[in-house]
């Protein structure tokens, strides 16, 4: 089933010296339960396109559809809270909160009672492969791989069907990178998420179902 679709999407902005066409007439679609990579050199438009899929920016031309509904007509904050989880290279965990408390945040935004939110957060931490003791630890006590797993658990805590990840393994060593990619694969193929990652890493791209390449704002599907 198609979850996300871009139709003739373009995005440009004015830099100090010139107009920059970051995304040029991109059309593509993403299905439920599939793992996708978007690759390309720095400045090719990958992260800009991901921000459009996340509703962080709006296309200058074209339309992004979420299960057939134009994203432009939706409450974009609600979309990111309830439908699309965004994960970044920097983990963005709150340093004064434990792992469990970090994961509880989106649940509390949804007015879920604290006891139930704590229970759900613990289950999510287990789902991403973390031992129960990690839930009581603060970010500075965790490895990079553990912090990224907490970030993924927090991102999917409120539900939804889409994971948008911008270089999620960029700060990790090869062992932790492999574990995080395996987790994203499981979330796609076992849990039914549509997982889209931006990556420079060919090893990461090789583990996905489909690969799109961007160059100078244009996109082509290469697998």
Regions found by a protein language model. Name each.
Residues 54:
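Helix-to-loop junction immediately C-terminal to a conserved catalytic motif
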Residues 62-71:
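Conserved ABC transporter NBD signature motif
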Residues 97-105:
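Short coil-to-helix segment of the ABC ATPase nucleotide-binding domain corresponding to the Q-loop/switch region
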